[in-house]
């Protein structure tokens, strides 16, 4: 929305680019230069694509900024240059990848002496990496021509950005064939051997770490690629070279050469751990103890790697006994002399990984060296080192759950549960695991009884004891573990049994009880357990089985059919379209010249229905349709009626006849005022000549219905106003607020409805009635009115009225096309209330006036023939 309406402030860059002498630094000083570049600003990109601008951008990246500059702005232009070149603009990438002069200038950064500027190296690596990903063939061909590229990468491997560039070269090339060519090229350049040579005590720590991390990433990337491409015809040459025995032997010989360098040893062990990474299947009951990497066996360990490590196990064992020299460490707990150190911790991790392979030759070597006993001693010696405790716990869990052993030639032999598991026997007999657990537990309880602090390894010791108990009951070596416990001295065995039932049981109970008593949410899984525990007698077993079957069927159907179908709920747009389509099918054709049979049928139906009505009730029928007519002022109505003068003034005779129907013999300017506060128990019929009435004549009503006061002089307003017309209604004939107000329309003559025309004409001539004079002298005002056609439903009949709007007062005027008579609505007009036909039927036939002549009856009959039944507005 913000950009759509162009509400953002215009960039100053466009103004600068209009200058001919604008410089690159002036553009780089602008804050929004990066945004404009990424937004593909055409002028800016054309400026940056100039040869001198691209050379300056590359120069900012590879050249050291002056030392005398302020540190805050010293690397401003190199940073902006890097962002501009790596904004992933195709034109810039094409120019950099195609012009060899720019690539040579960029490549010259590697020719600098080590160590490189870390920040500039990151800029260089980022630019070259995006070029490798966008233009892999051009960049790889360029690098292959540079015979010293691999040498320079190895030279600057201590810089982390150069290590990232090497990994980008292996990962950013997605097509299989170009990637395979890059791997073969790097393998021919002996990249693996050169990285292994860096892991040497003579090299510095940064080079150790980056070389080790590079080799580890190469191993992981190669294995992942092998899993993704199952049908790969060519193996990964880098991984194959790294898994060779001579490479592993070279790596181990480097770290054990003369002096012991902790950085080199740790880096080499990290490479070995990556080579030994396998995802083994978890064993039951030891999920919490085993590391997440043991989920399943995905990678197979090359036996050449195991053989090379086995030959150097004695050297690793010596590291456990005599680690590299470390200074005494003072901690809050006490003095550590010597501390565990990273070297010994990684050696124990290596032993744990070797135990995961479960190779018999390696296990035999560990038994002879008593490496398990040494790490157990370290477990109880270093009370507060939880990293050490975790690795020892994993080693013991792996030994207890190792049912199979791999031979030296890689085959796996099945052992009987009572067979010889030498490593397990070594753990129980020589290492005396049970005795040491009991001694440590009793020592901790004694220390706590004296007010001392609980040992830090007690949690791990509890888990190890639970692991032994679980292996006794279940697990692949349950029989052997039970036999080994029985072979323990009787005193030790009794202490162990007492410990399992008392101390260990209480500890487990205490660990499983929630410390905070809160209201727990009831789980749905608990319901299933409750249902399963319900017992049934033997006689009802078949019935219960059948009930279970029915419940399964009902549950599956209930779950599938529960709720509402999504198809039943369409989008709002769909619903709107459907309703709109249906509206288009409705026929709005209205025919005002309907046959008189329809009106005759409705009149007969009304007569039938009225037989069931209470004739003597003055109360209003709530189910009866009310007719509303707006009685306007006479002059306005005449003016409105004159808009269609060609229809309403066909002849002087018709004009005279229709005008007489609306004239009052008393005063046409009289105004009617109705007291609405009178009680609503009145009965009257204010039928307008256009209304179709049923029943007897109404001429005998006379002036008793209305008692009018002396009319007031009319105001010279040019419009009939009824607001000042006062009418005194009797208490029983008060006007009802909800009485219908009729609208006058005309239609074809209908003879059956003209029987009582005489009474209607007599009523119109009564002095107390309200009359409206329809004249045609307002034709000059018709030019200011707008005419609109309006459709009015008259019962089952349809009529089209012309809606005329006065331009001055915006008064809506309804005009009938047939009758050429119109009514209008103004804010000052009153409602003329019409009583329904049933009141007229109750009036006696003597209401007809005595002076009604046959000529009047004939005119009224003719008029009523043109009247149609009014429908509600």
Curated annotation (Swiss-Prot):
GO MF, one example: protein phosphatase regulator activity
Protein's GO biological process: regulation of signal transduction
Low complexity bias: start-end ranges: 729-739
A Pfam family the protein falls into: SAPS
Classification via SUPFAM superfamilies: ARM repeat
Top-level division of the source organism's lineage: Eukaryota
Acidic residues compositional bias, start-end: 644-655
Annotated segments matching region Disordered: 628-659, 693-715, 729-755, 767-787, 840-873
One Gene Ontology cellular component annotation held by this UniProt entry: nucleus
Role played: Regulatory subunit of protein phosphatase 6 (PP6). May function as a scaffolding PP6 subunit.
Family listed: Belongs to the SAPS family.
Subunit structure and binding partners: Protein phosphatase 6 (PP6) holoenzyme is proposed to be a heterotrimeric complex formed by the catalytic subunit, a SAPS domain-containing subunit (PP6R) and an ankyrin repeat-domain containing regulatory subunit (ARS).
Name by which UniProt lists this protein: Serine/threonine-protein phosphatase 6 regulatory subunit 3
Gene name tied to this protein: PPP6R3
């Amino acid at each position: 929305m913000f950009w759509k309406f162009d509400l953002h402030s215009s960039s100053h860059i466009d103004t600068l680019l209009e200058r001919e002498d604008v410089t690159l630094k002036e553009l780089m000083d602008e804050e929004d230069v990066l945004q404009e570049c990424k937004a593909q600003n055409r002028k800016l990109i054309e400026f940056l694509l100039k040869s001198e601008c691209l050379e300056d951008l590359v120069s900012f990246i590879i050249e050291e900024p002056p030392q005398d500059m302020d540190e805050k702005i010293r690397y401003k232009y190199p940073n902006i240059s890097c962002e501009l070149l790596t904004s992933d603009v195709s034109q810039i990438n094409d120019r950099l990848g195609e012009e060899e002069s720019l690539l040579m200038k960029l490549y010259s950064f590697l020719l600098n002496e080590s160590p490189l500027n870390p920040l500039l190296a990151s800029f260089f690596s980022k630019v070259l990496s995006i070029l490798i990903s966008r233009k892999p063939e051009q960049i790889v061909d360029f690098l292959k021509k540079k015979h010293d590229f691999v040498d320079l990468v190895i030279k600057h491997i201590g810089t982390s950005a150069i290590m990232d560039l090497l990994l980008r070269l292996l990962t950013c090339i997605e097509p299989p064939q170009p990637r395979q060519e890059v791997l073969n090229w790097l393998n021919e350049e002996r990249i693996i051997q050169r990285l292994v040579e860096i892991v040497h005590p003579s090299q510095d720590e940064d080079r150790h770490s980056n070389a080790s991390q590079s080799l580890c990433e190469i191993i992981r990337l190669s294995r992942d690629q092998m899993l993704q491409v199952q049908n790969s015809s060519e193996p990964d040459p880098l991984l194959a070279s790294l898994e060779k025995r001579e490479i592993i032997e070279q790596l181990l010989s480097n770290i054990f050469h003369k002096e012991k360098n902790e950085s080199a040893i740790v880096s080499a062990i990290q490479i070995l751990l990556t080579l030994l990474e396998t995802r083994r299947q978890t064993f039951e009951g030891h999920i919490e103890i085993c590391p997440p990497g043991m989920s399943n066996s995905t990678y197979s360990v090359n036996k050449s790697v195991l053989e090379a490590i086995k030959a150097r196990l004695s050297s690793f064992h010596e590291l456990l006994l005599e680690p590299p020299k470390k200074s005494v460490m003072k901690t809050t707990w006490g003095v550590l002399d010597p501390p565990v150190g990273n070297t010994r911790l990684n050696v124990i991790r290596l032993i744990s990984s070797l135990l995961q392979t479960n190779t018999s030759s390696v296990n035999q070597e560990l038994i002879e060296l008593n490496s398990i006993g040494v790490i157990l001693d370290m477990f109880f010696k270093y009370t507060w080192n939880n990293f050490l405790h975790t690795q020892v716990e994993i080693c013991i869990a792996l030994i207890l759950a190792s049912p199979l052993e791999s031979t030296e030639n890689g085959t796996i032999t099945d052992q009987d549960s009572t067979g010889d598991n030498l490593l397990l026997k070594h753990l129980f007999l020589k290492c005396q695991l049970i005795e040491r657990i009991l001694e440590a537990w009793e020592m901790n309880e004694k220390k706590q009884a004296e007010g001392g602090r609980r040992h830090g390894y007690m949690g791990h010791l509890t888990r190890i004891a639970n692991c032994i108990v679980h292996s006794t009951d279940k697990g692949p070596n349950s029989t052997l573990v039970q036999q080994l416990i029985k072979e323990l001295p009787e005193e030790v065995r009794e202490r162990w049994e007492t410990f399992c039932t008392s101390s260990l049981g209480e500890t487990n109970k205490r660990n499983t009880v929630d410390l905070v008593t809160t209201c727990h949410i009831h789980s749905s899984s608990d319901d299933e357990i409750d249902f399963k525990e319900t017992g049934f007698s033997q006689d009802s077993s078949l019935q219960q089985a059948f009930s279970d079957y029915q419940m399964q069927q009902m549950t599956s159907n209930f779950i599938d059919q529960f709720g509402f179908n999504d198809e039943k709920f369409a989008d709002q747009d769909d619903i709107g379209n459907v309703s709109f389509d249906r509206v288009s099918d409705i026929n709005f054709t209205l025919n005002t010249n309907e046959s008189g049979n329809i009106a005759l049928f409705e009149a007969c139906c009304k007569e039938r229905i009225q037989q069931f009505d209470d004739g003597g009730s003055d109360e209003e029928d709530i189910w009866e349709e009310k007719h509303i007519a707006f009685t306007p002022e006479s002059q306005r109505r005449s003016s409105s009626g004159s808009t269609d003068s060609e229809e309403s003034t066909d002849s002087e005779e018709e004009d005279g006849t229709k005008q007489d129907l609306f004239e009052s013999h008393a005063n046409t300017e009289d105004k009617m005022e109705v007291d609405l506060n009178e009680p609503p128990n009145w009965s009257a019929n204010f039928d307008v000549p256009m209304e179709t009435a049923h029943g007897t004549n109404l001429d005998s009503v006379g002036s008793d219905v209305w008692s009018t006061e002396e009319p007031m002089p009319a105001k010279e307003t040019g419009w009939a106003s009824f607001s000042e017309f006062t009418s005194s209604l009797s208490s029983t004939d008060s006007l009802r607020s909800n009485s219908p107000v009729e609208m006058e329309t005309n239609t074809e003559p209908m003879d059956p409805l003209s029987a009582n025309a005489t009474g209607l004409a007599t009523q119109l001539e009564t002095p107390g009635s309200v009359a409206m004079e329809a004249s045609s002298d307002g034709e000059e005002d018709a030019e200011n009115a707008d005419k609109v056609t309006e459709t009015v439903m008259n019962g089952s009949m349809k009529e089209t009225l012309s809606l005329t709007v006065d331009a001055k007062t915006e008064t809506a005027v309804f005009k009938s096309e047939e009758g050429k008579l119109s009514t209008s609505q103004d804010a000052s007009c009153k409602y003329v209330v019409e009583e329904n036909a049933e009141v007229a039927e109750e009036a006696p036939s003597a209401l007809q006036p005595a002076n009604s002549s046959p000529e009047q009856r004939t005119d009224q009959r003719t008029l009523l023939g043109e009247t149609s039944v009014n429908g509600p507005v």
